[in-house]
Swiss-Prot record:
SUPFAM superfamilies: Dimeric alpha+beta barrel. Its EC number is 5.1.3.32. It is found in: Cytoplasm. This is L-rhamnose mutarotase. The keyword Isomerase applies. It catalyses: alpha-L-rhamnose = beta-L-rhamnose.
Amino acid sequence: MIQKAFKMKLFEGKEEEYKKRHNEIWPDLVKELKSHGTSKYLIFYDKDTNILFSYIEMENEELWDEIAETDACKKWWAFMKDIMETNPDNSPISVELSNVFNLK
């Protein structure tokens, strides 16, 4: 299993809206995530910095990368762009984080 972590940034005061939207996540997006090998996806929020921390477990990085080309993902990005920092294509500005410790 491949593990990845990313950070993204939420706009000030948008935590509740972010939670609401994810509590109502679209079934077609969930289906795409799972069909592209995502087995676990957790998102945490740091209220002091508005940083979102995402942890993902996936079967295959190439499959994961293909999610960005799906209609469901592109629509979700457009839906979320008003509450978080995004790139010109509406994808979240995200920075991959390095794993520095793993207790086994």
